[in-house]
Amino acid sequence: MQNITQSWFVQGMIKATTDAWLKGWDERNGGNLTLRLDDADIAPYHDNFHQQPRYIPLSQPMPLLANTPFIVTGSGKFFRNVQLDPAANLGIVKVDSDGAGYHILWGLTNEAVPTSELPAHFLSHCERIKATNGKDRVIMHCHATNLIALTYVLENDTAVFTRQLWEGSTECLVVFPDGVGILPWMVPGTDEIGQATAQEMQKHSLMLWPFHGVFGSGPTLDETFGLIDTAEKSAQILVKVYSMGGMKQTISREELIALGQRFGVTPLASALAL
């Protein structure tokens, strides 16, 4: 019998959650992570599955995700503990044939359940599947320190925030030319914030929840982690710059245009126009 904890997807989740905790982005039970899988990924590990998988209904049907397996972090679970006990802190779930709920196939032992942000994740997965023709498979939420700090001092506007991050570090425009979406503050763990996030995810791979955290999407765990890491690095630079009195010079609009042309990306027009 193959051990599922040695699979690429469990090992990938262990690395991503451990790295995020070491970055200081996921204190206590902060943050959550989901990865969309294929049946072929989990097929070799059926012997590891629960004999009687628990069924949990979704608060709203998601037919686009019907029959789709995911590996997810658990509700109330600490990222720092995933590496110590993957089966207690992670779970593999599979959405049923009509998208009305899911079965917990593996993990989430002792009656644990998936992250409370699962509605936001699943809704965002639906939108990113459509926006990227199925390329994006990961949704990651974390409490990236400097990005959160900037939501207290910058205007919480997509164009303004995006432009500042682009100017904070040259690689940002290349990594997220579609900019950073921003919501008003909302109560977490609700369908409302999930729907609002998913709506912005139609246009942006990176989302900010002011005074709370960040939501990122990408095709792989590494790409999604790297997306957030790049934005957070720029935010860290900006925090230092603002604390030293602000910018005296920066990357110009013309230089941003040239950067986009060099790397074959189309920058968010509203941010470029500022």
Curated annotation (Swiss-Prot):
Question: So where's the catalytic machinery, residue-wise?
Answer: E117
Against SMART domains, the record matches this protein to: Aldolase_II
Keywords, A to Z, come to: Cytoplasm, Lyase, Metal-binding, Rhamnose metabolism, Zinc
Sorted alphabetically, which SUPFAM superfamilies does this protein's record hold? Answer: AraD/HMP-PK domain-like
What's the main place this protein lives? Answer: cytoplasm
Cite a single GO MF annotation: rhamnulose-1-phosphate aldolase activity
Task: Write out the residues that bind Zn(2+).
Answer: H141, H143, H212
Which pathway does UniProt place it in? Answer: Carbohydrate degradation; L-rhamnose degradation; glycerone phosphate from L-rhamnose: step 3/3
User: What cellular component GO annotations does this protein have?
Assistant: cytosol
Q: Where in the cell is it found?
A: Cytoplasm
Alphabetical GO biological process terms: pentose catabolic process; rhamnose catabolic process
Q: How is the cofactor bound?
A: Binds 1 zinc ion per subunit.
Required co-factor(s) are: Zn(2+)
Tell me what reaction this enzyme catalyses.
Answer: L-rhamnulose 1-phosphate = (S)-lactaldehyde + dihydroxyacetone phosphate
Give the PANTHER family listed for this entry: FUCULOSE PHOSPHATE ALDOLASE (PTHR22789), RHAMNULOSE-1-PHOSPHATE ALDOLASE (PTHR22789:SF16)
What is the documented function of this protein? Catalyzes the reversible cleavage of L-rhamnulose-1-phosphate to dihydroxyacetone phosphate (DHAP) and L-lactaldehyde.
Q: Which NCBIfam families does this one have? A: PRK03634.1, rhamnu_1P_ald
Complex and partners: Homotetramer.
User: What family, per the record?
Assistant: Belongs to the aldolase class II family. RhaD subfamily.
By what name is this protein known?
A: Rhamnulose-1-phosphate aldolase
